[in-house]
Curated annotation (Swiss-Prot):
Residues 651-672 are annotated as: MPER. A motif (YXXV motif) lies at residues 701-704. Residues 391-414 are annotated as: V4. SUPFAM superfamilies: gp120 core, Virus ectodomain. Residues 569-585 are annotated as: Immunosuppression. Residues 25-673 are extracellular. Some HIV-2 isolates have been described that can infect cells independently of CD4, using CXCR4 as primary receptor. These isolates may have an exposed coreceptor binding site. It comes from Human immunodeficiency virus type 2 subtype A (isolate ST/24.1C#2) (HIV-2). Residues 506-526 are annotated as: Fusion peptide. This is Envelope glycoprotein gp160.
Length: 712
């Protein structure tokens, strides 16, 4: 008897466990979960010039940041934000400078005479050493005749071309910068055979008009439904798989458009310290300079410059200098405590965790790239008021490195070129010769672009021409994310089970970023506020879209529907599309407009359950990412079956309403069923009757025609 009781109790416990221990999939809407995204960002600026207005929306300064208690990976080089910045600044650059007419290169042989000036950009005088450091009160700054500076090196050329008149050649005279032509070295006489140095290019682009390239400040903003995360760790060096100080933002900080090699100008990341962003897999670096040293660069191009157009043939015009007029060289002066700043760079490099070279700063040197590199690499290349300067940095490097027996100056000679290698895409642009009058540019030097080649005996910091690296420093601590508010987790509650009544409460709308405030909280704590969070999400999305719509309305250029205009307008509808997509997915599971939705689908993996008090939703989502597809499919199948069951139930329950008894269509249908049943019964009785009659006949029946009796 006792054994039977124990068996009964065990069976009860087993039944209870089967009922209550089964875990079911529960859908949560409004969880703080995100994943990396790569959608287009839109830019905002306060610059009101024409081309900047076309490219970006007006800036309204209505942005916020919220600290998150999470750990996230950041990479300045594998980053959609920095890549978009490079692409967009290139677009701004081309829009401003406007090299817009494509021409066939001028590749005829020319007879040229060299008119060598006193000193040239490419080979500054180094036969006699000189140490000249100019200051604010130096007279040569005003007269542009500092030691070593001379006139531009030019070449006077003659060549024949046809085109203006049929089968008739015309002799042209043209003066070129010596850097824009290549002469045959075998010629020893004064008159040499020369070609333009772009003749190996199939198509080049010539500037339509002379334009300024003034830097502009702008910021990037994420479309509604997306956000930007920023690593706020002071030790962040461009690559950090576990950044623990993370903030969420709708927009980036303001940044400057920068286009230069060797140095970055007017950056926004300078602090009272020197720090280095280092590529995670090679020796590329971008070094942020300490703003304490007040490092600036002043570039000047003396006046007395004239330009004349030369018509080569119909539709082909080149602009040139008048013959035998040589302008004075452009030059750049480096102001500030440069030697101290460079020493601090070396000390910072020696302490960097990625650095494996010598710790002796005397063996760490700044060097220039090889002379055989492209001009933009071999020289410091920058843009001053629309003109492209190529500066030979030999004097400067000798000065900061204190190289004895070498010419040392804190200024360098520069050369202006018409034919430019594009810095972002492979190609060449031909720009108009420099405009007349004096040009002056003053910029703050905030960073160095360099490659680090370290060794036990010596380390070389080689200046680089990677313009894109400037934006790794400006925006490399950001990453773009897409908020995915739908989450799955196992619970013991099955659909249609009674749930505790929740008291209603007001929602404090923090905007869209308020949606992420519980990202660092445990799953259980975050789940308690899902109802408020989902409403916050929708309210924040609508608010964010309204702000974007306001700035679009304020920009009249958007009515032209340029490429950027359509891009920014598309950003406005991204969040609604995303929200509707989420709701459509929830609806396919029978969970539309619910914050917590219990289902009848059993949890697929009993060993994988969340610790509601010690794990965040972001961590949990990473664990079950491989199961989400199967869970989603199971939820859809369960919802389809649920709808079928509901349909059948509704058919059975259709007679419980008294009015349905008087529905003629229902009566006709069931009358048909009755007729079918009666006819079936009649047919069945007829079959039974025939069978019975045959059975009786077989028992007493003799055949009428039987075999005749046999007679003996």
């Amino acid at each position: 008897m006792c054994g039977r009781n124990q068996l009964f109790v065990a069976s009860l416990l087993a039944s209870a466990c089967l009922i209550y221990c089964v875990q079911y999939v529960t859908v949560f809407y409004g969880v703080p979960v995100w994943r990396n995204a790569s959608i287009p960002l839109f830019c905002a600026t306060k610059n009101r010039d024409t081309w900047g207005t076309i490219q970006c929306l007006p800036d309204n300064d209505d942005y916020q940041e919220i600290a998150l208690n999470v750990t996230e990976a950041f990479d300045a080089w594998n980053n959609t934000v920095t890549e978009q910045a490079v692409e967009d600044v290139w677009s701004l650059f081309e829009t401003s400078i406007k090299p817009c007419v494509k021409l066939t290169p001028l590749c005829v042989a020319m007879r040229c005479n060299s008119t060598t000036a006193k000193n040239t950009t490419s080979t500054p005088t180094t036969t006699t050493t000189a140490n000249t450091t100019i200051g604010e009160n130096s007279s040569c700054i005003r007269t542009d005749n500092c030691t070593g500076l001379g006139e531009e090196e030019m070449v006077d050329c003659q060549f024949n071309m046809t085109g203006l008149e049929r089968d008739k050649k015309k002799l042209y005279n043209e003066t070129w910068y010596s850097k824009d032509v290549v002469c045959e070295s075998k010629d020893t006489k004064k008159e040499k055979t020369c070609y333009m140095n772009h003749c190996n290019t199939s198509v080049i682009t010539e500037s339509c008009d002379k334009h300024y390239w003034d830097t502009m400040r702008f910021r990037y903003c994420a479309p509604p439904g997306f956000a930007l995360l920023r690593c706020n760790d002071t030790n962040y060096s461009g690559f950090e798989p576990n950044c623990s100080k993370v903030v969420a933002a709708t927009c980036t900080r303001m940044m400057e458009t920068q286009t230069s090699t060797w140095f970055g100008f007017n950056g926004t990341r300078a602090e009272n310290r020197t720090y280095i962003y280092w590529h995670g897999r090679d020796n590329r670096t971008i070094i942020s300079l300490n703003k304490f040293y007040n490092l600036t660069i002043l570039c000047k191009r003396p006046g007395n410059k004239t330009v004349v157009p030369i018509t080569l043939m119909s539709g082909l015009v080149f602009h040139s200098q008048p013959i035998n007029r040589r302008p004075r060289q452009a030059w750049c002066w480096f102001k500030g405590e440069w030697k101290e700043a460079m020493k601090e760079v070396k000390l910072t490099l020696a302490k960097h965790p990625r650095y494996k070279g010598t710790n002796d700063t005397e063996k760490i040197r700044f060097i220039a790239p090889g002379e055989r590199s492209d001009p933009e690499v071999a020289y410091m290349w920058t843009n001053c008021r629309g003109e492209f300067l190529y500066c030979n940095m030999t004097w400067f490097l000798n000065w900061v490195e204190n190289r004895t027996n070498q010419t040392q100056h804190n200024y360098v000679p520069c050369h202006i070129k018409q034919i430019i290698n594009t810095w972002h895409k492979v190609g060449k642009n031909v720009y108009l010769p420099p405009r007349e009058g004096q040009l002056t540019c003053n910029s703050t030097v905030t960073s160095i672009i360099a490659n680090i080649d370290g060794g036990e005996n010596q380390t070389n910091i080689t200046f680089s021409a990677e313009v894109a690296e400037l934006y790794r420093l400006e925006l490399g601590d950001y990453k773009l994310i897409e908020v995915t508010p739908i989450g799955f987790a196992p619970t013991s509650i099955k659909r249609y089970s009674s749930a505790p009544v929740r008291n209603k409460r007001g929602v404090f709308v923090l905007g869209f970023l308020g949606f992420l405030t519980t990202a660092g909280a445990a799953m259980g704590a975050a789940s308690l506020t899902l109802s408020a969070q989902s409403r916050t999400s929708l309210a924040g999305i609508v608010q964010q879209q309204q702000q974007l719509l306001d700035v679009v309305k304020r920009q009249q250029e958007m009515l032209r529907l340029t490429v950027w205009g359509t891009k920014n307008l598309q950003a406005r509808v991204t969040a609604i599309e995303k929200y509707l997509k989420d709701q459509a997915q929830l609806n396919s599971w029978g969970c539309a407009f619910r914050q917590v939705c219990h289902t009848t689908v059993p949890w697929v993996n009993d060993t994988l359950t969340p610790d509601w008090n010690n794990i965040t939703w972001q961590e949990w989502e990473q664990r079950i990412r491989n199961l989400e597809a199967n869970i989603s499919e199971s939820l859809e199948q369960a919802q389809i079956q649920q709808e079928k069951n509901m349909y059948e139930l509704q058919k059975l329950n259709s007679w419980d309403v008294f009015s349905n008894w008087f529905d003629l269509t229902s009566w006709i249908k069931y009358i048909q069923y009755g007729v079918y049943i009666v006819v079936g019964i009649i047919v069945l009785r007829m079959v039974i009757y025939v069978v019975q009659m045959l059975s009786r006949l077989r028992k007493g029946y003799r055949p009428v025609f039987s075999s005749p009796p046999a007679y003996s």
